[in-house]
């Protein structure tokens, strides 16, 4: 029986985290503000400066793009 109670309590905890489903939207918005430039912006800057976005057949990561943009300044 105690194991069942344990699973029930965890299930309730999960529902509480899911409950304020509006909060993740706010969180992502806040983190986006703190990140500075978003990946989309990086791609646009790279395109305008003539920096290739693709390397070895795959897209560059945000950090790699950031480095290349910094170097090109």
From Swiss-Prot:
- Which residue windows are transmembrane per the record? none
Q: Which GO terms describe its cellular component?
A: virion component
Q: What is this protein called?
A: Structural DNA-binding protein p10
Q: Main site of residence?
A: virion
The record's region (Disordered) falls at 1-35
Q: What does the UniProt induction comment state?
A: Expressed in the early phase of the viral replicative cycle.
The lineage's top-level taxon is Viruses
- Print the keywords alphabetically: DNA-binding, Late protein, Virion
Instruction: Give the family from UniProt.
Output: Belongs to the asfivirus P10 family.
Annotated localization? Virion
Record GO terms (molecular function): DNA binding
Q: Provide the function of this protein.
A: May play a role in genome packaging through direct interaction with viral DNA. Binds to ssDNA and dsDNA with the same apparent affinity in vitro.
């Amino acid at each position: 029986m105690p194991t069942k109670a344990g699973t029930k309590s965890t299930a309730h905890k999960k529902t509480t985290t899911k409950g304020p489903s509006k909060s993740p939207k706010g969180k992502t918005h806040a983190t986006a503000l703190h990140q500075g430039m978003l990946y989309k912006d990086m791609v646009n800057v790279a395109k305008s400066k003539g920096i290739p976005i693709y390397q070895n057949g795959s897209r560059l990561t945000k950090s790699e793009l950031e480095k290349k943009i910094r170097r090109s300044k």
